[in-house]
Amino acid sequence: MELEHESKRPLYIPYSGPILLEFPLLNKGSAFTEEERRNFNLHGLLPEAVETIEEQAERAYRQYLDFKNDADKHIYLRNIQDTNETLFYRLLDAHLNEMMPIIYTPTVGEACEHFSDIYRRARGLFISHPNKAHIDDMLQNATKQNVKVIVVTDGERILGLGDQGIGGMGIPIGKLSLYTSCGGISPAYTLPVVLDVGTNNPQRLNDPLYMGWRHPRITGKEYDEFVDEFIQAVKRRWPNVLLQFEDFAQKNAMPLLNRYRHEICCFNDDIQGTAAVTLGSLIAASRAAGRQLKDQTVTFLGAGSAGCGIAEQIVAQMKSEGLSDEQARARIFMVDRFGLLTDKLPNLLDFQNKLVQKSSSLAKWDVNNDSISLLDVVRNAKPTVLIGVSGQAGLFTEEIIREMHKHCERPIVMPLSNPTSRVEARPEDIINWTDGAALVATGSPFNPVKYKDQEYPIAQCNNAYIFPGIGLGVIASGAKLVTDGMLMAASRTLANCSPLAQEGQGPLLPLIDDIQEVSRKIAKQVAKEAQIQGVATVTSDGALDEAIERNFWKPEYRVYKRTSF
């Protein structure tokens, strides 16, 4: 009752008239009461009827249904977000399963490609390299003063779409919408940021309406110094903020994470979030088959920072189940465009070197040339798990999937590339090629597959199962860093929420409609692990539960009282 009372306290604000109506965090639209209309000089600026938020949401949903394509639905929802954020999140609460693919993947990819064309209103911060001397001033200009979560991108690797320049801003905006709708983090505490370091995309550079810095991307020392200036400015402005790196190119993603993960509370969702949700899904899938993860043999298509990040988390879990480091790594096969990563390949990246296969262990393999293909690996290594993070459509061919099924009664196939147009194989094909035996999880949403009068649910291995709970756990506990142990706690908690693993039937991952409860559970275990690892103050379980609920924002209108400047 005490927490409920806190949420219903009046909010004292100084704004009135048209200024108040233009403030998305405070605007209630037609839901301003008669008293509020009188006190805040709103009479005549609104229609006569005073409505509830439920009535507003019903109207908004009817309007939403009038749009026939997903891109227009995205623009419509973004317009509501930019005019009345409470209504926006109330609408998402009621229709999250339907609207998540609209506000984020896959539709957000198209919005990023056309960012300058569909631009309506500023949101977040655009930190451009030509203004690098004024980063502190730009952070002071943010309309939100008490920022607790920042999602930042430089727009170079947007989903599977590549360099979109400042169009990449659509990703931090969408991601933070999920922090709020899935993890209960108040929109007043979130800030999307794009670092405008130029673009190498000729379509953007030659577009007369492109709104970003029309310049080739800065690189090397110049780039590193600019990012560092931003990080140091953030530390000065909001020293306790959680910073999420999003959609940075492979050449920058891991170095930035390694450089700053012990300096500021930060993580990279493409590397660590993807790894955490994939690991949670694999633990659950293994349990559903009556096995442990250490019993699986895993092949990856895609050996970039995301793929290698997932692989390292799998190694850590296998070791916790009793394997040695060497034994665990021997069960992981990384394939990229040049073939299987082995100790004979030159010019490997640092994070790839620990995941190579020893050539001596492959001596008896039946292969025809020096480049060992994915099909070669499937034939010889006989994987039980196949994970795609290549960003290339159709590479899980019928021949590869059927070959895998020859030696694996219930293969686990996870084509994780986004958006839908880049998926390695479509779920209906995988189900058909394995005669309904495969357990499939994808990166983008897919409808259930019907095969031989049976319906197969397709789990979306969506990072939204993980990062909102991490954010909530960090805020509730006051954690100073995001550790590997905290990420592992998130994975294991997600696995414990799997209907298939717990009940032997149903989907591999929880329903999206249950994601807020999943986020609460993840937040608690992340916070407890932060305390165990010494990056958060130790409190009781009860105090932690209370902190999580206190920080779990709900889209409800507060009563407003007038104050003066």
Swiss-Prot record:
Site (Important for activity): 270
Cofactor: Mg(2+); Mn(2+)
GO molecular function terms listed in the Swiss-Prot or TrEMBL record: malate dehydrogenase (decarboxylating) (NAD+) activity; metal ion binding; NAD binding; oxaloacetate decarboxylase activity
GO annotations of cellular component type: cytosol
Cofactor annotation remark: Divalent metal cations. Prefers magnesium or manganese.
Enzyme class of the recorded protein, top EC level: oxidoreductase
Keyword match Metal-binding: yes
Stored Pfam families: malic, Malic_M
Gene Ontology BP annotations: malate metabolic process
Alphabetically ordered keywords of this record: Metal-binding, NAD, Oxidoreductase
Subunit structure as annotated in this protein's UniProt entry: Homotetramer.
Recorded family membership: Belongs to the malic enzymes family.
Name of this protein: NAD-dependent malic enzyme
Gene: maeA
